[in-house]
Amino acid sequence: MACIENVLGGHAPSPLVVSVDKNGNQELHHDMPLQCLSSKPEDDAEPWGQPQVPLRPSVNVLTDLDSKQLEWPSERTGSCIPLHSLRAHRHPYGPPPAVAEESLATAEVNSSDALAGWRQEGQDAINVSWEVSGGPPALIVGGTKVNNGGTERGSNNARLHVALPQGKGFFPPRGPQVRGPSHIPTLRSGIVMEVPPGNTRIACRGKLAHVSFPLRGPCHPMHNWPRPIPLSSSTPGLPSCSTVHCFIPPRPPIFNPFLTMPLPFAPPPIFGPPLPSYFAHFHSGGMPAPASPNREHS
């Protein structure tokens, strides 16, 4: 017989008993006492309403070892592990926390799952560093430096230290490199300077900057730039040498401190009688003479 329990909300209101005969037919019996065979004794049997919580099995590495092998020293190492100390450090649910942390740390460094954490934003750091001893460059990723000698633990992440041979390895540039034109004339405050292409730091190589000063009207500055005039050995006043190019600045205008004044000209002739003078109506005899102060006192 088999027992089936219809559990709804943690309660079992209607138990069903299914009986199977020899031919394989099933018969349902209602309102019958529930009888189930259990391998557990009655004292250890748990109620059906409570779920069973499986306990974590205890993991002990030293269970398969014999007590004699632990107490007696081994032939290879010659070390002796007392049995009473191992029994004192046993943990009911597995190895002690210190051993578990060491095993997890070793597994994290040796496994490839630690590489997934380096993809997080803000924690990626790829640096190429040279050793102090002058060896090949090394690629460092993250926070802990893993070397052939051992493992150095950092504060944040684990670093991967890979030695690279010199002359090998490709590292893409960090940003796009945009190269400008070979030479661009610069115009500042009316002074045009044109630097020839090449290394401008090396002097005395026959490459000098051409500087011109436009002194003409306020039109487009390109129209005021003087053009180079080729000078050959046939030009008078110059020594016999190869053909050279030079700039001859234009002559400055003559400075005139006086402003341009109009020229004086004679007035046009007047056809007609001359106008009488303004003082012609006044006669000298008709004007009274001023009285002197001496006559009043006399």
Swiss-Prot record:
InterPro entries, sorted: DUF4645
Matching Pfam families: DUF4645 (PF15488)
Disordered, as annotated region: 36-56
The protein's name in its UniProt record: Proline-rich protein 32
Organism: Homo sapiens
